[in-house]
C-alpha cells in the first residue's frame, strides 16, 4: 500500500503533465464545464456495477492518473476494474457531492462517501468525507484524479487489530 501524503515521482509527473495551461479548457461555468462536472456526479452518484462498467471509460481519459488512499493507476480501464472490485464487499454505496470549487482548470469536489457493507446489517451505513482534485482534457474527460480522505474512518477500523491500534494512537494524540 502507498501513502497518499507523499508526493512520489508518478504523482509529480502526472501533476506536471496535466497542468491546465498546457491545453484548452472551457471558460468557468460555461456549458462545457457544467457538462464535465455533471458526468462526474452522474458516475459517482449511481455507484453500481452497471453504471461503473458502462461509464468509467466515458468519464476518464484512456491515459489518466488516479490515486486514492489505497491504489494508483494510469489508465481508465484499470480504474474501472478497481472500482468494480471495490463493490464486492458492499451491499450498497453512494457518494453525495456537497460542493465544488474551481481555479484555472483545477477542480475540487467535496463529497461524503456512504458504504453499506455486506457483513453488517443492511442499512448500517459507514460514512467518510473527502475531497477530490481533478483536471480534465480538452474533450472533457478526467486526466488527473487525486482523492484526499482518511481511510481510518471507514475501512481500517473494520479490521479488529487496526481498530485497536487506531484507537490507541488517537488516544495518545
Task: Give the location of each predicted region.
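Short, low-complexity N-terminal intrinsically disordered segments enriched in polar/charged residues
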Residues: 1-54, 58
Amino acid at each position: 500500500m502507498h501513502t497518499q501524503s507523499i508526493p512520489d515521482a508518478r504523482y509529480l509527473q502526472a501533476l506536471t503533465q496535466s497542468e491546465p495551461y498546457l491545453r484548452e479548457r472551457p471558460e468557468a461555468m460555461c456549458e462545457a464545464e457544467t457538462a464535465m462536472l455533471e458526468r462526474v456526479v452522474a458516475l459517482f452518484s449511481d455507484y453500481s456495477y452497471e453504471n461503473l462498467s458502462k461509464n468509467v471509460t466515458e468519464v476518464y481519459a484512456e491515459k489518466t492518473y488516479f490515486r486514492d488512499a489505497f491504489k494508483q493507476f494510469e489508465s481508465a480501464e484499470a480504474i474501472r476494474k478497481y472500482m468494480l472490485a471495490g463493490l464486492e464487499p458492499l451491499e450498497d454505496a453512494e457518494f453525495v457531492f456537497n460542493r465544488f470549487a474551481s481555479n484555472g482548470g483545477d477542480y475540487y469536489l467535496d463529497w461524503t462517501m456512504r458504504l453499506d457493507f455486506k457483513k453488517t446489517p443492511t442499512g448500517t451505513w459507514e460514512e467518510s468525507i473527502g475531497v477530490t482534485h481533478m483536471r480534465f482534457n480538452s474533450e472533457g474527460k478526467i486526466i488527473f484524479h487525486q482523492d484526499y480522505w482518511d481511510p481510518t474512518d471507514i475501512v481500517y477500523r473494520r479490521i479488529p487489530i487496526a481498530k485497536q491500534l487506531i484507537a490507541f494512537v488517537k488516544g495518545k494524540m
